[in-house]
Amino acid sequence: MAGKTLYDKLWDDHVVTQRDDGSCLLYIDRHLLHEVTSPQAFEGLQLAGRQPWRLSANVATPDHNVPTSKKERDQGIAGIEDDTSRIQVQTLDDNCKAFNIVEFGINDIRQGIVHVVGPEQGLTLPGMTVVCGDSHTATHGAFGCLAHGIGTSEVEHVLATQCLVQKKSKNMLVRVDGVLGKGVTPKDVVLAIIGKIGTAGGTGYAIEFGGQVFRDMSIEGRMTVCNMAIEAGARVGMVAVDDKTIEYVKGRSYAPKGEQWEQAVAYWNTLHSDVDAVFDAVVELNGAEIEPQVSWGTSPEMVIPVSKAVPTLEQAKDDVQRNDWTRAYQYMGLNAGQALADIQLDRVFIGSCTNSRIEDIRAAAEVVKGRKVAPSIKQAMIVPGSGLVKQQAEKEGLDKIFLEAGFEWREPGCSMCLAMNADKLQPGEHCASTSNRNFEGRQGNGGRTHLVSPAMAAAAAIAGHFVDVRSF
């Protein structure tokens, strides 16, 4: 009998019962909540007269709608100008109080983007099933977790039962061996993967990321890669547990202590695919060949190395891709064959659940130090992923580096990743962004998003256009 993959092990460990249709009832260890997908779920509980099944499994924080300007944040929820956003944040606050759920509120130092806060607090632990009403929940798979996003009706179901009906995915291994070159980051790795397999390449699969590149990669880097598994079409992305994983978790607020810690570590050390495990699909890349990446179009798969030009229609693989590229040229205001360096940028955004952790901010600061934002850039902003990330960056003096260069240093939140708060692009503006999606209107109506790493975004802010950070 063949060995098990990591996904198989996690799935089997959480099956409560198997149903006649082949689906399974899975037990959920951790449920993370935010203000956008939870109001109707809480209302459903209230109407049915139910209480959360296991209070301690649920933790909430507002992130999508919170303002990132200090002036507004100092006023708390009342400082949120948009009525809908304010109501959503207030409703989360009210619901958490009514149901006695732990919430890191808008001015709590622990508040931040839910996928930054979970690992930071030790709420995300190896071997867990982790769900959240947010598609980028795959981030937590970096800890050897089975983590994925859920819809609002499922949020209610998890609150009420601590279980979820799911159908098992197939197994895919994405193996990246070799050593990354100077200036090549985890963000470039995952963009290169998506560029290779496309945004539907992982559909129906749980992706395990393996190989030397991931063994060498930091935990925060692994979070960046797993975060964008959904952009590759997979709900689930994960990396096997190793010593780095355990060291990262150790001592965090919600991590086990004492004898429980020793028992947990013994289990966590089993969380890897067996050597004889069989995957349904295997994708391989050579890490040494990956360059800094820049997305040029309106899908994450429309991505190329910074050294290349916008592809021409002759390079498209079929009529569907030709049509997609033609529409993307028009929306993005680009020409086929245009050099990336010729794209005039208007704004730079360094933040989001993909790239707002302390390592990301350090990488950007290293590029920015002693330089100035180009006069042609209307706005360059750094948005830490949590209050604690912000605090650590300020302790290291990174905020001063950015402020002296002409960047804005903001309060934590989802910010310009999506047009659900005050941080938005204007129509026609080009933005170098460390976020995860570049769909039409994602950062604001008519806004044009280019996905890059923190180092590439920082270099673009200084130059006013895209440059190869390796020679910057």
UniProtKB/Swiss-Prot annotation:
Entry EC number(s): 4.2.1.33
Any Pfam family hit: Aconitase
Pathway it works in: Amino-acid biosynthesis; L-leucine biosynthesis; L-leucine from 3-methyl-2-oxobutanoate: step 2/4
Protein origin, superkingdom: Bacteria
Keyword Chloroplast annotated: no
Family matches, as InterPro entries: 3-IsopropMal_deHydase_lsu, Acnase/IPM_dHydase_lsu_aba_1/3, Acoase/IPM_deHydtase_lsu_aba, Aconitase_4Fe-4S_BS, Aconitase_4Fe-4S_dom, IPM_dehydratase_rel_enz, IPMI_cat
Keywords annotated in UniProt: 4Fe-4S, Amino-acid biosynthesis, Branched-chain amino acid biosynthesis, Iron, Iron-sulfur, Leucine biosynthesis, Lyase, Metal-binding
SUPFAM superfamilies cross-referenced by the UniProt entry: Aconitase iron-sulfur domain
Reactions it catalyzes: (2R,3S)-3-isopropylmalate = (2S)-2-isopropylmalate
Cofactor(s) needed for function: [4Fe-4S] cluster
A GO term, aspect molecular function: metal ion binding
Role this protein plays: Catalyzes the isomerization between 2-isopropylmalate and 3-isopropylmalate, via the formation of 2-isopropylmaleate.
Subunit structure: Heterodimer of LeuC and LeuD.
PANTHER family, sorted: 3-ISOPROPYLMALATE DEHYDRATASE, HOMOACONITASE, MITOCHONDRIAL-RELATED
Family note: Belongs to the aconitase/IPM isomerase family. LeuC type 1 subfamily.
The name this protein goes by in its record: 3-isopropylmalate dehydratase large subunit
Organism: Acinetobacter baumannii (strain ACICU)
